[in-house]
């Protein structure tokens, strides 16, 4: 597997250095270990269904009842492909936010909370409307409070697109983007090579299972039938037959090219931290932005190790989830200073 490399890596910030767990720096171990160390949600989530203007819904998993915590700084999490609160990175970060006295929430993309969504659409890497609507609803419903958004993988690319599209109008004070596939087409091809095919097969099975549940619950809400769905063998094929078609793109390549955040990064106006690992097995080297393409309010951190949304440090007996400290530490300036 080829590592992500760039001749410009030294020009980026590398504050808060990530040191991988001794003996476990391998990218695949880093990618898979979080599921061993973060198996269960350690807090009792407060669930809320948010009805959307088009008749669909998204489910919210809060760290506590938001009506009783409207004064607290807010941390919003956007998960990755087929992720949810149960994803180790999601509930781990919400728990970390809770420990700091912040209000944390995971906004599940349509159909990702365990119940199929109703409408003739799903979610994708460039679908920013739901996130935008939710962030504005959050402010209307609970009033003004310092707010940060964090996006992982697919959710990270989506968040980058949202930040670029809305600039200073987006009601967040800062953002963090982790392991985002900023060049969707290149990453799609990368997932079809070498050991990365194992991850593609895993994710594709999740996508197909979710789509099958949607077809069973709401027949006709996807542009293919169950027999066609079963024959899909690659994520690119899934995107070609379903994601692109249902959202008005010509095909998967058209979807990838229109929704890749790379060309939009220079339009991000809010303070933003972007984190990638050089050895991310999901990524192609093309996800690395050129230093001159980033505005001064965007900090880029490229680590030697970490895998895909892994970043496990410490020891086997005392593992340290680096993102659960790095992200809140970086956001403190924007969340706690404004709440004083």
Region locations from a protein language model:
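Conserved alpha/beta-hydrolase
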Residues: 86, 94-118
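Catalytic active-site module of serine/aspartate enzymes centered on a nucleophile-bearing elbow/loop
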Residues: 304-340
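Catalytic nucleophile-loop/oxyanion-hole region of alpha/beta-hydrolase
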Residues: 110-148
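N-terminal cap/lid segment of alpha/beta-hydrolase-fold proteins
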Residues: 24-70, 312-318
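The serine-hydrolase catalytic nucleophile loop
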Residues: 83-95, 285-287
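Short beta-strand/loop motif that positions the catalytic acidic residue
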Residues: 268, 274-276, 280
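Alpha/beta-hydrolase-fold enzymes
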Residues: 4-10, 140-246
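Short beta-strand element of the alpha/beta-hydrolase
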Residues: 71-80
């Amino acid at each position: 597997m080829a590592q992500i490399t760039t001749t410009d890596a030294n020009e980026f910030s590398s504050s808060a250095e990530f040191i991988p767990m001794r003996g476990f720096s391998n990218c695949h171990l880093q990618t898979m270990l979080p599921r061993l160390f973060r198996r269960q949600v350690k807090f009792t989530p407060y669930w809320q269904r948010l009805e959307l203007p088009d008749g669909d819904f998204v489910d919210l998993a809060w760290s506590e009842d938001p009506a009783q915590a409207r004064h607290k700084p807010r941390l919003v999490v956007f998960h990755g492909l087929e992720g949810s609160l149960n994803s180790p990175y999601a509930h781990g970060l919400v728990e970390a936010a809770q420990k700091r006295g912040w209000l944390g929430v995971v906004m599940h993309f349509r159909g990702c909370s365990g119940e199929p969504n109703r409408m003739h659409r799903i979610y994708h890497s460039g679908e920013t409307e739901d996130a935008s609507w939710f962030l504005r609803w959050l402010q209307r419903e609970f009033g003004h409070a310092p707010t940060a958004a964090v996006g992982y993988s697919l959710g990270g690319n989506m968040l980058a697109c949202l930040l670029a599209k809305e600039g200073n109008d987006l009601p967040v004070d800062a953002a963090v983007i982790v392991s985002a596939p900023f060049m969707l087409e290149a990453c799609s091809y990368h997932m079809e090579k070498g050991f990365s095919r194992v991850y593609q097969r895993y994710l594709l099975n999740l996508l197909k299972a979710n789509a099958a549940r949607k077809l069973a619950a709401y027949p006709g809400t996807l542009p293919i039938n169950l027999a066609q769905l079963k024959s899909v063998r690659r994520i690119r094929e899934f995107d070609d037959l379903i994601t692109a078609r249902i959202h008005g793109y010509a095909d998967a390549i058209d979807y990838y090219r229109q929704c890749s955040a790379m060309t939009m990064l220079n339009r991000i106006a809010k303070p933003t931290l972007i984190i990638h690992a050089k050895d991310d097995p999901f990524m192609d080297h093309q996800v690395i932005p050129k230093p001159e393409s980033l505005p001064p309010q965007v900090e880029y951190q490229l680590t030697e190790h970490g895998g895909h949304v892994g970043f496990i440090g410490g020891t086997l007996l005392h593992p340290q989830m680096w993102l659960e400290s790095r992200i809140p530490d970086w956001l403190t300036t924007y969340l706690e200073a404004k709440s004083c």
